[in-house]
Amino acid sequence: MYDISKWKHVFKLDPNKEISDEHLEMICESGTDAVIVGGSDGVTIDNVLHMLVSIRRYAVPCVLEVSNVEAITPGFDFYYIPSVLNSRKVEWLTGVHHEALKEFGDIMNWDEIFMEGYCVLNPEAKVAQLTEAKCDLTEDDVIAYARMADKLLHLPIFYLEYSGTYGDVELVKKVKAELQQAKLYYGGGISNVKEAKEVAQYADTVVVGNVIYENIKAALQTVKAVKGE
């Protein structure tokens, strides 16, 4: 079994976006610690299955980040269930989770399932609009969400999500200092080695996504930048 607490770098693939077989092979053979499959919209059982079958040709660990209960399928190593802590809609805090447990609770392997406490910080991002996230947060607001995830809810992952834009590294540093047991995931706007290294100083796990579709070479370079190998 893989140990997610040791993952430093992961790629995130959107099942609703096209990626060539050649680029997928590069991603899966890059030395990244895992590949997360997930997106904010257009996630279906068909495109999730297509992505799963494609990734399973390689040895890399594979995670489904659940945003649509109807797109859940067996075959992934782990399942990440996001709870958007700064969402104004209860369905993104506990609603989707309740639905999933009603449908799959009897057959869930709890060793494969991890909750993520998301704090979404880019109001322009699809995920912010979908979840109606309150993004105009102060530093104290964000730290309070981090403490909530870590100390009140005892979540294994606190995820700072800037989705499409590069975030505030000083804030990442301060959030990391607050967390005792939760691992800090950072996602958003990483497009080069410099940014990847900068964030990796503080985040436990750096998530690289959009740049895969914009500049595959730059995406691949982030692996060594983060892991220092």
UniProtKB/Swiss-Prot annotation:
GO MF annotations in UniProt: heptaprenylglyceryl phosphate synthase activity; magnesium ion binding
Residues that, per the record, bind sn-glycerol 1-phosphate: 12, 159-164, 189, 209-210
GO terms under biological process: glycerophospholipid biosynthetic process
Catalytic function, reaction form: sn-glycerol 1-phosphate + all-trans-heptaprenyl diphosphate = 3-heptaprenyl-sn-glycero-1-phosphate + diphosphate
Biochemical pathway: Membrane lipid metabolism; glycerophospholipid metabolism
Record: residues binding Mg(2+): 14, 40
Catalytic activity, EC: 2.5.1.n9
Keyword ATP-binding: no
The protein's required cofactors: Mg(2+)
InterPro entries from the UniProt entry: GGGP/HepGP_synthase_I (IPR039074), GGGP/HepGP_synthase_sf (IPR038597), GGGP_HepGP_synthase (IPR008205)
One of the Pfam families matching this protein, by short name: PcrB
SUPFAM superfamilies from the UniProt entry: FMN-linked oxidoreductases
Protein family membership: Belongs to the GGGP/HepGP synthase family. Group I subfamily.
Description of how the protein assembles with itself and partners: Homodimer.
PANTHER family the UniProt entry points to: HEPTAPRENYLGLYCERYL PHOSPHATE SYNTHASE (PTHR40029:SF2), PTHR40029
Name this polypeptide is given: Heptaprenylglyceryl phosphate synthase
Organism: Bacillus cytotoxicus (strain DSM 22905 / CIP 110041 / 391-98 / NVH 391-98)
This protein's encoding gene: pcrB
